[in-house]
Curated annotation (Swiss-Prot):
<dbReference type="InterPro" id="IPR018354">
    <property type="entry name" value="Snake_toxin_con_site"/>
</dbReference>
<dbReference type="GO" id="GO:0044218">
    <property type="term" value="C:other organism cell membrane"/>
</dbReference>
<keyword id="KW-1052">Target cell membrane</keyword>
<dbReference type="InterPro" id="IPR003572">
    <property type="entry name" value="Cytotoxin_Cobra"/>
</dbReference>
<protein>
    <recommendedName>
        <fullName>Cytotoxin SP15d</fullName>
    </recommendedName>
</protein>
<dbReference type="GO" id="GO:0016020">
    <property type="term" value="C:membrane"/>
</dbReference>
<keyword id="KW-0964">Secreted</keyword>
<keyword id="KW-0123">Cardiotoxin</keyword>
<comment type="similarity">
    <text>Belongs to the three-finger toxin family. Short-chain subfamily. Type IA cytotoxin sub-subfamily.</text>
</comment>
<keyword id="KW-0800">Toxin</keyword>
<dbReference type="Pfam" id="PF21947">
    <property type="entry name" value="Toxin_cobra-type"/>
</dbReference>
<dbReference type="GO" id="GO:0031640">
    <property type="term" value="P:killing of cells of another organism"/>
</dbReference>
<dbReference type="InterPro" id="IPR054131">
    <property type="entry name" value="Toxin_cobra-type"/>
</dbReference>
<comment type="subunit">
    <text>Monomer in solution; Homodimer and oligomer in the presence of negatively charged lipids forming a pore with a size ranging between 20 and 30 Angstroms.</text>
</comment>
<dbReference type="GO" id="GO:0005576">
    <property type="term" value="C:extracellular region"/>
</dbReference>
<feature type="disulfide bond">
    <location>
        <begin position="54"/>
        <end position="59"/>
    </location>
</feature>
<keyword id="KW-1053">Target membrane</keyword>
Amino acid sequence: LKCKKLVPLFSKTCPPGKNLCYKMFMVAAPKVPVKRGCINVCPKSSLLVKYVCCNTDKCN
């Protein structure tokens, strides 16, 4: 699985066990990602922070 880094032009191959790509952003600014990368379990979103997870190459 390949996931985009914070700068979308770059991507990285996820290590074994981390089989989801994720994008994290502030609820107040949904168009501006704060973090991107590989993760094993999708974190829960909160009132301030939203996570979007997916499992295909560069889907974040």
